[in-house]
Swiss-Prot record:
InterPro entries: ATPase_NBD, Heat_shock_70_CS, HscA_NBD, HSP70_C_sf, HSP70_peptide-bd_sf, Hsp_70_fam, ISC_FeS_clus_asmbl_HscA. GO terms for molecular function: ATP binding; ATP hydrolysis activity; ATP-dependent protein folding chaperone; unfolded protein binding. This is Chaperone protein HscA homolog. HAMAP family: HscA.
Length: 616
């Protein structure tokens, strides 16, 4: 098979020139950056030998600081010290205020409802704050490697949605970084242990960080990681261990709850030091606020046992969601500094029936996996391993209504890979769907290459939008594409296999990519027009069905107004004025609101007919 370089046609790197890449673990509490040097992945330290960078930024009028310096200002200047910004990524202001009502920041909403944080440096959004953390990590890597980075792999939680992932990409772009790939954190941890090239089967990744707990159940098949289930607790982490132990020491030392900040800081520092020491020792001596006493590992275990049990309950739920039993799990990977606690390792081992993998520093394992992946994607592997560099040369997708192409797997995605997307029916009672597989970078079907067609039949006859079809694209290591369409409620499915790159030369691929750039603006306008025409057709189809069923609910005058609005929409939909079509759709919606309300009332009355209030 032809081996395809990641670089753009005509811009290939010199054959023996090593490119600089890094893996970044952008964490809630701490972040790290790692790279591969002399064949070994390692995290990079600052000038004081510290590998972790606190995910904290302190803003002032004159500038900002990131990391340890910023963290010291958390208690002194709370409003201008932003921490745990990862929790805010990709969320609306309303969502943030509902989820995290006790945040000490002053927020404003942007025009599109996104959060803006009031600081001494002005209004800042979570993307900007994340970008400042990424810049600090990139600067550390640039200095250590003595050169600018050619690309980075950034890790994200497996449960991150599209908005959160896009926010992370935007932050990287703002930081001046080229993102080779966003990699799921549990997948990165598995890669660090080499599980991506080992035995196929189910892998559990137990991630207990400072502020959150995540459990991910993965299935490895032919080098492809599939996330079967995720779970956890966003309000449970190692910080809770610290607070329980601090409360116990406070009680033993008779320290008032509301003593001054200096004593509270001293108490917390002593608590954290004791927790760390108890990972190796059976007991530790604690000195705080003039009090000295012994804390045993057994006492600490009793305090945290209920919290550890909560994590195992989340593991049980995730296994149930994944449809697998604990004894089916081949390996358990430990991630997060709090997994150093002996009780955690012991209970996790008992739960899964096997000792967890702990040989790699749990704080560093995700960053190390990201660095390994970045080294592959940037093109540093020798020829004997070049297969890992094979990529999809052109985007793969599907034809949707209006002759549009919906991309499912973007070009330059490394293979093997699997991606899925959900689609729905366009017409009432639709029982079949034609699946048209496309290849190319343009927005319209007429400008892309047709790869294959097949039909999915046996879809239940439901109203438009009622049936949900999941279409899965899977490309194996040989570049063979399998497309499967499955109706979710019935399980009925159909599939086809095709070789996407068959028959295309490198020059043809380059030409298709060049065309996509040359016609980008024109294509976007064409797509917007096609989308509005599809929406107009959907609105008219729905309206005609409603009128056929319930026209008696309208007076002659009301019917005339609706008919006029529909006729106008039908007329402008034949043209190419996007704004006119959009306004005509809004007008139909406005003129039919009362009609829709009457239809709803009539449906409710029919449903309740013959039933008493008590029955309802």
């Amino acid at each position: 098979m032809a081996l395809l370089q990641i670089s753009e046609p005509g811009l290939s790197a010199a054959p023996h020139q090593r490119r600089l890449a890094a893996g970044i673990d952008l964490g809630t509490t701490n972040s790290l950056v790692a790279t591969v040097r002399s064949g070994q992945a390692e995290t990079l330290a600052d000038h004081e030998g510290r590998h972790l960078l606190p995910s904290v930024v302190h803003y002032q009028q004159q500038g900002h600081s990131v990391g340890y310096d910023a963290r010291t200002n958390a208690a002194l200047d709370t409003a201008n010290t932003i921490s745990s910004v990862k929790r805010l990524m990709g969320r609306s202001l309303a969502d943030i205020q509902q989820r995290y009502p006790h945040l000490p920041y002053q927020f404003q909403a942007s025009e599109n409802g996104l959060p803006m944080i009031e600081t001494a440096a002005g209004l800042l959004n979570p993307v900007r704050v994340s970008a400042d953390i990424l810049k600090a990590l990139a600067a550390r890597a640039t200095e250590a490697l003595a050169g600018e980075l050619d690309g980075v792999v950034i890790t994200v939680p497996a449960y991150f949605d599209d908005a959160q992932r896009q926010g992370t990409k935007d932050a990287a772009r703002l930081a001046g970084l080229h993102v080779l790939r966003l990699l799921n954190e549990p997948t990165a941890a598995a890669i660090a242990y080499g599980l991506d090239s080992g035995q196929e089967g189910v892998i559990a990744v137990y991630d207990l960080g400072g502020g959150t707990f995540d459990i991910s159940i993965l299935r490895l098949s032919r080098g492809v990681f599939e996330v079967l289930a995720t779970g956890g607790d966003s309000a449970l982490g190692g910080d809770d261990f610290d607070h329980l132990l601090a409360d116990y020491i406070r009680e033993q030392a008779d320290i008032p709850d509301r003593s001054d900040n200096r004593v509270q800081r001293e108490l917390l520092d002593a608590t954290i030091a004791a927790k760390i020491a108890l990972s190796d020792a059976d007991s530790v001596t604690v000195n705080v606020a003039g009090w000295q006493g012994e804390i045993s590992r057994e006492q600490f275990n009793e305090l945290i046992a209920p919290l550890v049990k909560r994590t195992l309950l989340a593991c049980r739920r995730a296994l149930k969601d994944a449809g697998v039993e604990a004894d089916e799990v081949l390996e358990v990977v430990m991630v997060g500094g709090s997994t150093r606690v002996p009780l955690v390792r012991e209970r996790v081992g008992e739960f899964f029936g096997r000792p967890p993998l702990t040989s790699i520093d749990p704080d560093k394992v995700v960053a190390i996996g990201a660095a390994i992946q970045a080294d592959i994607l940037v093109g540093n592997k020798p020829d004997s391993e070049m297969l890992l560099l094979d990529v999809i040369p052109l985007s793969l997708g599907l034809e949707t209504m209006g002759g549009l192409v919906e991309k499912v797997i973007p070009r330059n995605t490394t293979i093997p890979v699997a991606r899925a997307q959900d689609f729905t029916t366009f017409k009432d009672g639709q029982t079949a769907m034609s699946i048209h597989v496309m290849q190319g970078e343009r927005e319209l079907v007429q400008d892309c290459r047709s790869l294959a067609r097949f039909a999915l039949r046996g879809i239940p006859a439901l109203p438009a939008g009622g049936a949900h079809i999941r279409v899965t694209f899977q490309v194996d290591a040989d570049g063979l594409l399998s497309v499967t369409a499955m109706e979710k409620s019935t399980g009925v499915e159909a599939s086809i296999q095709v070789k996407p790159s068959y028959g295309l030369t490198d020059s043809e691929i380059a030409s298709m990519i060049k065309d996509s750039m040359s016609y980008a603006e024109q294509d976007v306008k064409a797509r917007m027009l096609a989308e509005q025409k599809v929406e107009a057709a959907r609105v008219l189809e729905s309206l005609h069905g409603a009128l056929a069923a319930d026209a008696a609910l309208l007076s002659a005058a009301e019917r005339q107004v609706i008919d006029n609005a529909a006729a106008h929409l039908s007329e402008v939909a034949q043209g190419d004025d996007v704004d006119a079509i959009e306004q005509a759709i809004k007008n139909v919606d406005k003129q039919t609101q009362d009609f829709a309300a009457r239809r709803m009332d009539q449906s409710v009355r029919r449903a309740l007919k013959g039933h008493s209030v008590d029955e309802v």
